[in-house]
């Protein structure tokens, strides 16, 4: 099987930084899952004794705590500070940016519209910085059902697709008196998505490697399927199915921002033997 890798794929700056932080802070707790890749989390726990804790009330005083890449709600961060735990913040700088924008714009009286998944930890963290109730929408259709104010500020979950953000921005501009638009989709996400789109037009089958709970990985799969219907998401080489590759000659591979090189290489090696 011939293999072609996407031009851009895999670990982004924020994930690399977070993993380095975890490796340097052995025996710490991580408040929530550091990244959305279970196998890499297991590696960190096994080799560096960093463990996940989801409940801030269960974190002991004076304990070393790492904040996940997606950030956490403002009230949880304040709780940890008041409790006296030692905080190491691994929040991606690209996530901190929309947090700051939401806080600033809501204080100025803008209604916050956030394009994202309301259940995603990044989104939960970002909207916690709003001083008034924020609207969270995952599509233009969802936005069309919402009541809008005259002054609106638009931000996005960092892993969303730019064309869909532009659709929402256009809708708001047509209906609101004043609209502030902030493109908070991170550069690495945009590059990876474009590379996946370009590659999907060339190949017979596309394999997306990454965690099944990872937003950016699921976006890559969605993009790949636009031009390559035989696109599949796998967490590692063990999930590859031989039947997928029947009568296929060229396989494209991309990977989510939380996918380590060692997993990508294992997938690549197995496909090369088919």
From Swiss-Prot:
It catalyses: isopentenyl diphosphate + 2 oxidized [2Fe-2S]-[ferredoxin] + H2O = (2E)-4-hydroxy-3-methylbut-2-enyl diphosphate + 2 reduced [2Fe-2S]-[ferredoxin] + 2 H(+); dimethylallyl diphosphate + 2 oxidized [2Fe-2S]-[ferredoxin] + H2O = (2E)-4-hydroxy-3-methylbut-2-enyl diphosphate + 2 reduced [2Fe-2S]-[ferredoxin] + 2 H(+). Its cofactor is [4Fe-4S] cluster. This is 4-hydroxy-3-methylbut-2-enyl diphosphate reductase. The keyword Cell inner membrane does not apply. Its EC number is 1.17.7.4. The active site is at 122 (proton donor). The keyword Iron-sulfur applies. Keywords: 4Fe-4S, Iron, Iron-sulfur, Isoprene biosynthesis, Metal-binding, Oxidoreductase. GO terms for biological process: dimethylallyl diphosphate biosynthetic process; isopentenyl diphosphate biosynthetic process, methylerythritol 4-phosphate pathway; terpenoid biosynthetic process. Pathway: Isoprenoid biosynthesis; dimethylallyl diphosphate biosynthesis; dimethylallyl diphosphate from (2E)-4-hydroxy-3-methylbutenyl diphosphate: step 1/1; Isoprenoid biosynthesis; isopentenyl diphosphate biosynthesis via DXP pathway; isopentenyl diphosphate from 1-deoxy-D-xylulose 5-phosphate: step 6/6. One of its GO terms (molecular function) is 4 iron, 4 sulfur cluster binding. Belongs to the IspH family. InterPro entries: LytB/IspH. (2E)-4-hydroxy-3-methylbut-2-enyl diphosphate binds at residues 36, 70, 120, 158, 214-216, 258. HAMAP family: IspH. It is an enzyme of class 1 (oxidoreductase). GO terms for cellular component: cytosol. [4Fe-4S] cluster binds at residues 12, 92, 186. It comes from the Bacteria. Isopentenyl diphosphate binds at residues 36, 70, 120, 214-216, 258. Dimethylallyl diphosphate binds at residues 36, 70, 120, 214-216, 258. NCBIfam families: ispH_lytB, PRK01045.1-1. Catalyzes the conversion of 1-hydroxy-2-methyl-2-(E)-butenyl 4-diphosphate (HMBPP) into a mixture of isopentenyl diphosphate (IPP) and dimethylallyl diphosphate (DMAPP). Acts in the terminal step of the DOXP/MEP pathway for isoprenoid precursor biosynthesis. Binds 1 [4Fe-4S] cluster per subunit.
């Amino acid at each position: 099987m011939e293999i072609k890798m996407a031009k851009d794929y895999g670990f982004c700056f924020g994930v690399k930084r977070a993993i380095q932080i975890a490796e340097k802070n052995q025996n710490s707790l991580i408040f929530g899952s550091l990244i959305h890749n279970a196998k890499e989390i297991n590696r960190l726990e096994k080799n560096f004794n960093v463990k996940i804790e989801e409940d801030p009330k269960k974190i002991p005083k004076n304990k070393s705590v790492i904040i996940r890449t997606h950030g956490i709600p403002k009230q949880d961060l304040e709780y940890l500070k008041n409790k006296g735990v030692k905080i190491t913040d691994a929040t991606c700088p690209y996530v901190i940016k929309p947090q700051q924008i939401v806080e600033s714009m809501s204080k100025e009286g803008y209604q916050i519209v956030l394009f994202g998944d309301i259940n995603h930890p990044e989104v939960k963290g970002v909207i916690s910085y709003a001083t008034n109730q924020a609207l969270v929408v995952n599509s233009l259709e969802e936005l069309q059902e919402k009541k809008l104010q005259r002054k609106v500020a638009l931000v996005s979950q960092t892993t969303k697709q730019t064309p869909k953000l532009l659709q929402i921005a256009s809708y708001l501009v047509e209906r609101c008196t004043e609209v502030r638009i902030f493109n908070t989709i991170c550069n690495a996400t945009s590059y990876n998505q474009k590379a996946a789109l370009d590659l999907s037009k060339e190949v017979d089958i596309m394999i997306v490697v990454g965690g099944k709970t990872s937003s950016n990985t699921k976006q890559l799969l969605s993009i790949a399927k636009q031009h390559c219907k035989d696109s599949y998401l796998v967490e590692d080489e063990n999930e590859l199915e031989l039947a997928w590759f029947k009568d296929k000659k060229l396989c494209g591979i991309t990977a989510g921002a939380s996918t380590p090189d060692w997993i990508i290489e294992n997938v690549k090696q197995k496909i090369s033997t088919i």
